[in-house]
Each structure stands twice: as C-alpha cells, then as structure tokens.
C-alpha cells in the first residue's frame, strides 16, 4: 500500500533529525580516585615522593595540603626510609642585624640548577642576634644561649623542622654565648662561652631525660671564652676559639690543644664522613683526618674562586655544600654543591655538580650558619 504524502513527509522529517547526543560525564582524575582512599593510604603514597614535589601537590586539594602539613607524613617518611637531607641557612642583615632562616629548595621537573633557591621560613622562631650556639640533631635544630639586650642568657629551644614548631628547653645552669656544642652518646654537650672559672663550664643535656647535668672536665683558662666553631667526631668534640684549637673528651673530661688543627682550620667548615672540610691556605679546600692526624688538599678543584671570607659549609647528604656572597658587600648569595669521591691511594676528589645564585636580598647580609637536617 503506497504511502500518502503526509506520511512520507512525516517519515522524512524524522529521518533528517540528528540523533540525540549522548551525555558523557568527565572522567575522574587520578587525584579524584586517590581522594576516595583512607587518609592512611594517601599518606603512605605521599610519603614516598620527594619533598620538592610537595608545594605543587599541596595545590591539588585540601586533603593533600592537610596531610602534607601534618607531622604524620614525616613519621611515615622515616618508617619508609624516604627521609632527605635539607639545607637550612641563617642570614643576618647588615641593616637590621636580625637573623632570618631559609631552606634551600630543589625545584622539581628537571635538573636545571638555576631553579635552586633559598626560600625564607616565615614561621621559624626568632633567635638571639648574637652568640647563640646552633646544632642539628636528626630532624631537630637546637638553639642554646646567646645575647639578648646585652645580657647572656641560659635559655634554649628546639625546632622540629618537619613542622617548624618550637618547644622550650629547660634552662642551662650557666648563661653563655658563643659556646662550643657537640652531640655524643645521647647527650648534647655545651662547653665554654662563659667565665672559665665557672663550675658549670661544661654542661650536658640528656635528650632522653630532658635534663641538664654538669659535664666532666676541669676549668680551662687557656681557652677563650668565645668559641667560633665546634664539631663532634666519633667520641670527641673539636673546638676552635679565636686563637687555638682544642679537643674535648667527654668520657675522660680532658681538654687538650691541637696545634695541627690550627694550620688550616677556618670558620667556614663542616664534617663529612668523620673528616673536617675547610677553606685553608692557597684558596684550597683542605680535609683533616682526625685518625691519621693529617691535612690533605681536596683534589680536582684548582679553579675555585677565593671565597674563604664569609663562606659557610655543610654536609648535604655526603656532598659538600658551600654558601658564599658573590662578592664583598653584594646582595647576591651563591651556593656550590660538590660531589666527593675517594680514589686510589685514599685521596679524596671533588667534582662541582652545580653553582649559581640562590637568592638576591634587599641589603647585604652575613651568612651566619649552614646546617643540614633530616626530614
């Protein structure tokens, strides 16, 4: 039976209409799936990533931001053995004399060293302008003594670097400034920085009991009351004052001069693998082996610029980090990272991994300290 014109037109109009579009929901992102998981699993995933990615990941969601800011993530990183060595730097402005704390941030997405920057830590607690003793132990930084309003103080505090939170320590028995410090056998030793006739010339803070006790040792009038640098190596504490170098034995309570240390040791120095690295004579980096009792030049770095004055060194995960002013009075701070390698004959060689300006300040500043913390 033939179709009528009306029915034909109706069929034609139906055939010409485009089929309805299917509604497709946007595919959920990987982060959306991850957010459906319990916090414990998300935390475990985040803890496995390098810290340099955390600022970017924090922008993804409130959950990521909350977990990355929590102290639990650093506990998880420690359990997973994913901790990293982070460089902390104290700069003091020539204009205000106020110390400020910074961290060296290694940017993700490439190995371009121009991305490495010193970043200020706004939440870091203020410290005395002069004379404080600073030492890093694992993930914490201890700040002891110093001068406030022209008076030496006996107070101290510790900063938990993963969260940048601060807690006060019990006061030392003796107020002191520019004291030598060294961590040994669970105790933090503080030496000098006060009247050499004080009965508490040496004190030890027990990290387990959180108490101070007088340390072994006789008063030493030969050592200047202001020390410049100190390190704990094995079971001894090496001390530099304004004139001489000394070695303190906490077990025996003895303090002896070390003339060999005096020949090269300078303020800008650090300890790596039980050896002291320092800028010494002829603008060379020298290495002191306390067991062999010998200084030796770090090989392979004959063209380093003369940066002995005002530079600071630190152990950056087994590499040597050097922080220095670009030139005297400059507002530019530079950093150089050197890989260390022991070759035939026991000689230590250095290779520059990168070197560039890491911050430009508003006014010239002094590099007070460089130290590395595990987080």
UniProtKB/Swiss-Prot annotation:
It holds the Pfam family Kelch_FKB95. Kelch repeats lie at residues 140-186, 187-232, 275-321. PANTHER family: F-BOX DOMAIN-CONTAINING PROTEIN, F-BOX/KELCH-REPEAT PROTEIN SKIP4. Disulfide bonds: none annotated. The keyword Repeat applies. Residues 1-15 have a biased composition (Low complexity). InterPro entries: F-box-like_dom_sf, F-box/kelch-repeat_ARATH, F-box_dom, Kelch-typ_b-propeller, Kelch_1. SMART domains: FBOX (SM00256), Kelch (SM00612). Keywords: Kelch repeat, Repeat. Residues 31-77 form the F-box domain. It comes from the Eukaryota. The keyword Phosphoprotein does not apply. Residues 1-27 are annotated as: Disordered. This is F-box/kelch-repeat protein At4g39240.
């Amino acid at each position: 039976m033939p179709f009528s014109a009306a029915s034909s037109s109706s069929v034609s109009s139906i055939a010409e209409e485009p089929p309805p579009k299917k509604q497709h929901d946007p595919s959920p992102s990987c982060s959306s799936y991850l957010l459906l998981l319990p916090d414990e699993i998300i935390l475990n995933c985040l803890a496995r990533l390098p810290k340099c990615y955390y600022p970017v990941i924090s922008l993804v969601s409130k959950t990521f931001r909350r977990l990355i800011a929590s102290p639990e993530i650093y506990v998880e990183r420690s359990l997973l053995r994913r901790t990293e060595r982070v460089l902390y730097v104290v700069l003091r402005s020539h204009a205000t004399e106020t110390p400020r704390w910074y961290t060296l941030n290694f940017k993700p997405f490439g190995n371009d060293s121009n991305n490495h920057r010193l970043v200020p830590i706004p939440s870091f607690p203020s410290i005395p302008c002069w004379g404080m003793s600073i030492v890093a132990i694992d993930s914490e930084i201890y700040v002891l003594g110093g001068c406030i309003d022209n008076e030496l103080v006996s107070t101290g505090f510790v900063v938990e670097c993963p969260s940048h939170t601060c807690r006060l320590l019990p006061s030392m028995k003796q107020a002191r400034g520019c004291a030598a410090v060294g961590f040994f056998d669970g105790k933090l030793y503080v030496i000098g920085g006060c009247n050499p006739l004080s009965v508490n010339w040496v004190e030890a803070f027990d990290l387990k009991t959180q108490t101070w006790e007088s340390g072994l040792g006789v008063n030493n009038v030969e050592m200047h009351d202001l020390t410049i640098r100190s390190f704990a190596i094995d079971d001894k504490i090496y001390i530099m004052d304004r004139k001489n170098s000394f070695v303190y034995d906490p077990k025996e309570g003895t303090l002896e001069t070390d003339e060999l240390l005096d020949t090269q040791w300078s303020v800008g120095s650090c300890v790596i693998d039980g050896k002291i690295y320092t800028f010494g004579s002829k603008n060379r980096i020298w290495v002191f082996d306390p067991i062999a009792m010998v200084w030796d030049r770090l090989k392979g770095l004959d063209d380093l610029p003369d940066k002995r004055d005002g530079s600071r060194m630190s152990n950056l995960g087994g590499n040597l980090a050097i922080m220095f002013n670009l030139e005297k009075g400059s507002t530019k701070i530079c950093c150089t990272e050197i890989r260390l390698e022991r070759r035939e004959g026991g000689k230590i060689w250095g290779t520059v991994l990168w070197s560039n300006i890491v911050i430009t300040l508003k006014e010239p500043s002094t590099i007070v300290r460089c130290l590395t913390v595990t987080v």
